[in-house]
């Protein structure tokens, strides 16, 4: 609960609504994230640009399309996004792959828990 309270107090907590009903929530936090300082068995695809992190994403059961909506919102604000998930979370891992995130390696949370780390960087070309 303290992480969620901190997200709210810091202005990093977001709710996605459909027809006036909250259907999803997530935290969108400007980096650097201390747990992303060290990555194992891989490397970040882009490690020089500022980045944001998506954390604590959840949606109501039976809700569809919210991940895409969350990503659109986040990429409008930052073109370099990192996210992590549990090894066992095959639904999230498949969604990350579907929406263009690349697996980068393993990170460890402050409590030592392992997470699989992903990144997507969208660099717009000046040649239009």
Where are these regions (language model features)?
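Conserved active-site alpha-helix within GNAT-family acetyltransferase domains
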Residues: 88-105, 113
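Conserved beta-hairpin
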Residues: 11-28
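C-terminal "cap" of GNAT-fold acetyltransferases
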Residues: 109-128
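Conserved acetyl-CoA-binding loop-helix of GNAT-fold acetyltransferases
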Residues: 59-76, 93-98
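Conserved GNAT acetyl-CoA-binding A-motif
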Residues: 53, 76-88
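Active-site rim helix/loop that mediates acceptor-substrate recognition in acyltransferases
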Residues: 1-13
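Conserved acyl-donor/pantetheine-binding loop and adjacent beta-alpha core of acyl/acetyltransferases
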Residues: 27-62
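Charge-biased, low-complexity intrinsically disordered regions
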Residues: 54, 92, 115-117
């Amino acid at each position: 609960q303290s992480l969620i309270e901190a997200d709210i107090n810091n202005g990093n907590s977001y709710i996605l609504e459909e027809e006036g009903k909250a259907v999803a929530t997530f935290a969108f936090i400007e980096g650097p994230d201390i747990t992303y300082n060290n990555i194992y068995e891989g490397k970040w695809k882009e490690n020089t640009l500022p980045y944001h992190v998506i954390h604590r994403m959840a949606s109501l059961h039976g809700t569809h399309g919210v991940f895409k909506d969350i990503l659109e919102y986040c990429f409008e604000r930052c073109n370099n996004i990192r996210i992590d998930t549990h090894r066992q979370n095959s639904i999230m891992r498949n969604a990350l792959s579907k929406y263009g995130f690349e697996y980068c390696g393993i990170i460890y949370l402050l409590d030592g828990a392992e997470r699989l780390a992903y990144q997507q960087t969208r660099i717009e070309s000046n040649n239009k």
